[in-house]
A protein has these predicted regions:
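Transmembrane beta-barrel wall of Gram-negative outer-membrane proteins
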Residues: 126, 133-164, 168-210, 216-220, ...
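Short, acidic, small-residue-rich periplasmic hinge/interaction motif at the N-terminus
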Residues: 1-21, 59
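Outer-membrane beta-barrel architecture
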Residues: 30, 53, 95, 113-115, ...
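Transmembrane beta-barrel architecture of outer-membrane proteins
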Residues: 23, 27, 49, 91, ...
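Short acidic/polar hinge/loop motifs at secondary-structure boundaries
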Residues: 70-98, 223-224
């Protein structure tokens, strides 16, 4: 993690409260679109198919780490945000380091490095339920409990969520659940912090960007209000 006026690299830090304020029914990457050097879009796809570019470089040339662990695909360097749909509710801070990095990870960080933290010690104590609704049948329910740091330096965080939406056109429907558990320990007077996190995001979603082929219209398209098969047509 870069430090201001210490690490010689251009970076921007976004707190979890800022992300929570911007979230609404947006995906995680879309909450970062106002960060300098960052461009995001949904690639005409379904839920979780968003893309993020840092200084013009896509997934394959940008390193993504969550709690210090690389999450880019080991074969092609891509990252599938549909596997991290609950990240927007768990993030305590995000740091975007722009430009060529010196990371020793397998992914070449020509565009930069995006570091996401979900540390339990950085979350304010509290318990609550959040509900959100949007257009096209989107709704989301989230329940959470954060203990904060106690006198012994221990902290924990729990979260359970559910979301569903139809999307703004055919082929964008999706549904999923999110669960997370995190335990942290910060020794008194120490310079280190220990954190254990368990994150899951079971989901399914349609992928509209594959499109519909001409043959699909010939085989299944409506003809005078009826479905017809091209093989039966003269």
């Amino acid at each position: 993690v870069a430090r201001e006026r210490v690490t010689p690299i251009a970076f921007s830090s976004v707190s979890g409260s800022e992300i929570d304020l911007k979230a609404g029914n947006l995906e995680f990457v879309e909450t970062l679109k106002r960060t300098p050097g960052v461009y995001t879009n949904q690639d005409n796809g379904g839920y979780g198919d968003g893309q993020m570019y840092v200084r013009g470089f896509g997934f394959t040339n940008t390193a993504y780490v969550i709690n210090g662990q690389p999450v880019n695909d080991m074969e092609n360097g891509r990252i599938y945000w549909s596997n991290w749909m609950g990240l927007i509710d768990l993030t305590s801070s995000v740091q975007i380091q722009r430009g060529l990095g010196s990371t020793s990870l397998a992914v070449p960080s020509a565009g930069g490095t995006v570091s996401v933290n979900t540390r339990a010690a950085e979350v304010d104590p509290g318990t609550g339920i959040k509900m959100a609704a949007g257009d096209n049948g989107y709704h989301k329910f989230t329940a959470f409990h954060n203990t904060g740091v106690n006198d012994l330096g221990w902290s924990s965080s729990f979260l359970l969520g559910f979301w569903r939406g139809d999307g703004w056109r055919n082929g964008m429907k999706g549904e999923g659940t999110t669960y997370a558990f995190s335990v942290g320990y910060t020794p008194r007077g120490g310079d280190h912090e220990f954190n254990f996190s368990l994150i899951g995001a079971g989901q399914w979603h349609h992928q509209a960007y594959y499109g519909t082929q001409l043959q699909d219209y010939l085989d299944y398209g409506p003809i005078q209000g009826k479905r017809a098969c091209a093989s039966k047509r003269q």
